[in-house]
């Protein structure tokens, strides 16, 4: 038996997603496996993450699957993409999206100007190891880290303010998934600050190095503010574009593009 699943593919600054409405998945039992299959760039559609969404009482809920089938707690780029899709389908400009218990307030100012208020961030959570433990771990593996800071923005991020080559970022990103340091893994951000701009590369847990990471941009901006490296507003720079970051009353607001790629049908053999 073959199931036909309608999907939309979008990207935020190169960070790409396959988006499916939950109503099209009534006959699918294993969503995690479906996400892995759809995300495969050789045998599926290909993406960094799969997004499943639905609406209830004018609030949208979003579930995020990584390419390994695990769940992600937050994705800023996916939030902008989903907000734009909802805008294109319904005309709504003010959109509330829930990811777990996290409420994201979105505003579509124009088709390619989408703001997301991700709320406040935390620098003191139980999952965060001490700075001394991070540095001891780095010394053991001869990792060249500069200033570091842990940030929780709904998902866990480690911000490393240091310029590193992509091959070194990959090694460090993998090493820092060690259970002894971060029990559930961590998103590792490599940030370089110049003229109030943050040049950012992110190793996402469950996905690896991606072309952009919205939650990483929010976390890196928040850490940069706390350390006095940047001021609000600031710009986070990725390979395929920028995000404008602001802080208002303790809330982090991200503004950027979301690009529609295609609508299609995915055929799932049972």
UniProtKB/Swiss-Prot annotation:
Predominant location: cytoplasm
Residues at the active site: 75 (proton donor), 213 (proton acceptor)
Subcellular location: Cytoplasm
Gene3D superfamilies attached to this UniProt entry: Diaminopimelate Epimerase, Chain A, domain 1
RNA-binding keyword on record: no
Keyword Isomerase: yes
Annotated GO CC locations: cytosol
Amino acids binding substrate: 15, 49, 66, 76-77, 155, 187, 204-205, 214-215
EC main group: isomerase
Catalysed reactions, semicolon-separated: (2S,6S)-2,6-diaminopimelate = meso-2,6-diaminopimelate
Family matches, as Pfam families: DAP_epimerase
InterPro entries named among the record's database cross-references: DAP_epimerase_AS, DAP_epimerase_DapF
PANTHER family per the UniProt record, alphabetical: DIAMINOPIMELATE EPIMERASE, DIAMINOPIMELATE EPIMERASE, CHLOROPLASTIC
This protein's name: Diaminopimelate epimerase
Species the sequence originates in: Rickettsia typhi (strain ATCC VR-144 / Wilmington)
């Amino acid at each position: 038996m073959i199931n036909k699943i309608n999907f939309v593919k979008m990207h935020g600054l190169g960070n790409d997603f396959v988006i499916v409405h939950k109503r099209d998945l009534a006959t699918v039992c294993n969503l995690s496996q479906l996400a892995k299959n759809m995300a495969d760039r050789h045998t599926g559609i290909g993406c960094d993450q799969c997004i499943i969404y639905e609406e209830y009482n004018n609030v949208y809920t979003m579930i995020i699957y990584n390419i390994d089938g695990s769940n992600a707690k937050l994705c800023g780029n996916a939030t902008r993409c989903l907000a734009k899709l909802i805008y294109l389908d319904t005309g709504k400009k003010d959109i509330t999206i829930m990811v777990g218990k996290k409420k994201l307030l979105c505003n579509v100012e124009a088709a390619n100007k989408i703001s997301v208020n991700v709320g406040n961030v935390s620098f003191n959570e139980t999952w965060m190891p001490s700075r001394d433990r991070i540095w001891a771990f780095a010394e053991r593996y001869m990792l060249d880290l500069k200033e570091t800071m842990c940030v929780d923005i709904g998902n866990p991020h480690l911000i490393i303010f240091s310029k590193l080559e992509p091959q070194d970022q990959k090694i460090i990103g993998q090493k820092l998934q060690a259970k002894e340091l971060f029990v559930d893994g961590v998103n590792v951000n490599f940030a370089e600050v110049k003229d109030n701009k943050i040049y950012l590369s992110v190793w996402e847990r469950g996905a690896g190095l991606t072309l952009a990471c919205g939650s990483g941009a929010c976390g890196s901006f928040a850490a940069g503010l706390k350390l006095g490296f940047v001021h609000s507003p600031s710009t986070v720079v990725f390979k395929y574009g920028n995000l404008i970051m602001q802080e208002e009353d303790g809330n982090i607001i991200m503004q950027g593009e979301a690009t529609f790629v295609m609508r299609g049908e995915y055929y799932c053999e049972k």
